[in-house]
Amino acid sequence: MKFAWLLAPDTYWDEKKTFITAALESGIDHIVDTADSGRIKKLGNLTLISPDEDADIVLVGRDGEGDGTLELPETLEYSRDIEMASELSESGRQVAAYVEIRSKAHEELARRLGRVVDYLILVGEDWKIIPLENIIADLQEEDVKLIAAVADVDEARVALETLEHGTDGVLIEPADISQIKDIAALLENIESETYELKPATITRIEPIGSGDRVCVDTCSIMGIGEGMLVGSYSQGLFLVHSESLESEYVASRPFRVNAGPVQAYVMVPGGRTRYLSELETGDEVIIVDRDGRSRSAIVGRVKIEKRPLMLVEAEYEGMKVRTLLQNAETIRLVNDKGEPVSVSELGEGDRVLVYFDESARHFGMAIKETIIEK
């Protein structure tokens, strides 16, 4: 998963606090700083990267060989940064190394540090022309996260997307707060998956009695065309629409998906599924729109209540899938035109959007195995 850290600006406290607060509000909770550790820790539940011994991740290289404060020795066997990083790592501490790529010798310093630290921050005056990909390739087999220092969203995009391998994360050195928000939005877009939704034809729809159904209330507002992928079969999940439309019976609840009964699968991050009954406050689910674009959302509450259910069966190119939904006018699927349609108005021959996955599932993970669901 790609990530971003913030390098706190070297300025007076009130301005620094504004940048850190903006980062936290944008979901960036790893802060690199060398001067105000105590005050920063009071701003929220964050991870501090600092040379201080009480830091969550200890930083080496600032005021050392990594940033040019100390000259590199003739042989890296006598490198102060490598020695410090090795000692900290051996003592069980998480370590981040900071290296400005000033020369071939600094490239080699970065490679050596990448073999002993948890995180390696790479910095260059114009880092796009340094051999970043070579360093990435050399360290691919190592258990280290590579981070490129960037000033704006364009540099972040190159680091995370354009390079053949790309870095694991970026260290933001922003000139203004808008750059923090732009990079946070870029990360969300990079991490989002696209699901290929197919128009499946309804072959059967009928009431079947009562059962325990699950409403998933998220911490996000969903728009028209958005919902969750839910189904009785892991190999075929229906796009169940959010309660984002007004009804003559109830007010809209755009944070909610009335998803189905307790045994149904729901798509969650990482290409996994979970049972609806497993979800609880703080879990993550995937919100998908009618074009298959996705984003993650936090579960704020799950409500399980006994309600009348109906069976929906659909078929696409010989693949037949089913799901159960509450039998109510406010429960909607999404038709092949991308429009929400109430289950009370659906009939045989109508087409709705379904995500098909030929993989079998074991504890929610996709596996290559033959499985029959019916």
UniProtKB/Swiss-Prot annotation:
InterPro entries attached here? Answer: DHQ_synth
Q: Name one GO biological process term.
A: aromatic amino acid family biosynthetic process
- For the protein in the UniProt heading, the enzyme class is oxidoreductase
Q: Which family does it belong to?
A: Belongs to the archaeal-type DHQ synthase family.
* NCBIfam families documented for this protein: PRK02290.1-4
Report the function annotation for this chain: Catalyzes the oxidative deamination and cyclization of 2-amino-3,7-dideoxy-D-threo-hept-6-ulosonic acid (ADH) to yield 3-dehydroquinate (DHQ), which is fed into the canonical shikimic pathway of aromatic amino acid biosynthesis.
Q: What is this protein called?
A: 3-dehydroquinate synthase
The organism named in the record is Methanothermobacter thermautotrophicus (strain ATCC 29096 / DSM 1053 / JCM 10044 / NBRC 100330 / Delta H) (Methanobacterium thermoautotrophicum)
Ranked from the top, the taxonomy reads: Archaea, Methanobacteriati, Methanobacteriota, Methanomada group, Methanobacteria
